[in-house]
């Protein structure tokens, strides 16, 4: 049996840091309130730097390729999860292909599942390795949400940061990704929006979110999907070594960990330093944990994410 196994991880965050103290000067908020309600102390932001969605994706990809110790020429697919591409077209994946000088006989495409984008991309890549003969797939989660937040809206501008994370998935005989599950419900599509497209435009595109409703749904749906994927995989909660959640809100993360019976020390948390980096948050957290020596080869990881759409998903894997 062929598995998709993570061979390398990488990430990138902009240099500029926006702290809660900085936000206190911009909107009516406090460090104490943000920490209690969300769990974010600072976030990295593109601001006026030369960084953008593509450059961050490229830098994260380079680091994943370096860790995987592969020749970039062997990469046979690129999948990018993002909701904040530079352009309507070409895709971010094709721009990454260009900057990495990868060969032309490979598919490269973006998928948009907002904050769940990396889990969606990982699931697609897993199927291509299991069923279509792909050997090395570059999967990236990247977003620049600070470019679409309303900096006068204290309920949303405190949440988000920018960044990118990447993994190299490699075909392997040893267990890697065990299962993935993806769900969506468009009936909730108005709960998180950034309405600037071909048919509907805002003069300045801003992210809008009904926070209380999203919080309740996230706790419920993520709780259900982690139970579902553990059962589908024939495992027990006690088999999970690490939870790597989407870093959206510390209280949502704690609710999921409690449902799994996992102590805080077995949950990878970067929300305090990064904020919500959307599709980048899970691979960013994974990269940080691997490079810190927390997560090791053979550990069982549970990934879960929830975002606009509404779309949510989970992945269970052996590193």
Swiss-Prot record:
Predominant place of localization: cytoplasm
Entry similarity comment: Belongs to the thiolase-like superfamily. FabH family.
Source species taxonomy: Bacteria, Pseudomonadati, Pseudomonadota, Gammaproteobacteria, Legionellales
CDD domains xrefs: KAS_III
Function: Catalyzes the condensation reaction of fatty acid synthesis by the addition to an acyl acceptor of two carbons from malonyl-ACP. Catalyzes the first condensation reaction which initiates fatty acid synthesis and may therefore play a role in governing the total rate of fatty acid production. Possesses both acetoacetyl-ACP synthase and acetyl transacylase activities. Its substrate specificity determines the biosynthesis of branched-chain and/or straight-chain of fatty acids.
Subunit organization: Homodimer.
The protein's annotated pathway: Lipid metabolism; fatty acid biosynthesis
Name of the protein in question: Beta-ketoacyl-[acyl-carrier-protein] synthase III
Active-site residue list: 115, 246, 276
Compartments where located: Cytoplasm
A GO biological process held by the record: fatty acid biosynthetic process
Catalytic activity, reaction form: malonyl-[ACP] + acetyl-CoA + H(+) = 3-oxobutanoyl-[ACP] + CO2 + CoA
């Amino acid at each position: 049996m062929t598995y998709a196994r993570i061979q390398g991880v990488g990430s990138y965050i902009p240099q500029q840091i926006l702290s809660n103290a900085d936000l206190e000067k911009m909107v009516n908020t406090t460090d104490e309130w943000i920490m209690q309600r969300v769990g974010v102390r600072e976030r990295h932001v593109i601001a006026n730097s030369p960084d953008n969605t593509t450059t961050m994706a490229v830098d994260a990809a380079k680091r994943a390729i370096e860790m995987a110790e592969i020749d970039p020429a062997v990469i046979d697919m690129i999948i990018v999860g993002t909701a904040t591409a530079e352009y309507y077209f070409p895709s971010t994946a094709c721009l990454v292909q260009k900057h990495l000088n990868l060969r032309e006989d490979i598919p490269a495409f973006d998928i948009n599942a907002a904050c769940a984008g990396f889990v969606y991309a990982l699931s697609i890549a897993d199927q291509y390795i299991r069923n279509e003969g792909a050997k090395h797939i570059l999967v990236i989660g990247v977003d620049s949400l600070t470019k679409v937040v309303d900096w006068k809206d204290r309920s949303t501008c405190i949440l988000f940061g920018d960044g990118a994370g990447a993994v190299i998935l490699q075909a392997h005989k040893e267990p890697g990704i065990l299962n993935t599950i993806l769900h969506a419900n468009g009936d909730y599509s108005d709960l998180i929006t950034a309405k600037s497209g071909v048919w509907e435009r805002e003069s300045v595109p801003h992210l809008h979110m009904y926070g209380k409703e999203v919080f309740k749904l996230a706790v419920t749906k993520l709780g259900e999907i982690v139970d579902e994927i553990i059962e589908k995989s024939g495992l027990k909660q006690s088999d999970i070594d690490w939870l790597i959640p989407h870093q959206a809100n510390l209280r949502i993360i704690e609710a999921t960990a409690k449902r799994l019976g996992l102590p805080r020390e077995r949950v990878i948390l970067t929300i305090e330093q990064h904020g919500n980096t959307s599709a980048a948050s899970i691979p960013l957290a994974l990269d940080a944990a691997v490079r810190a020596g927390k997560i090791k080869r053979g550990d069982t990881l549970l990934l879960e994410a929830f975002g606009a759409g509404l779309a949510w998903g989970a992945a269970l894997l052996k590193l």
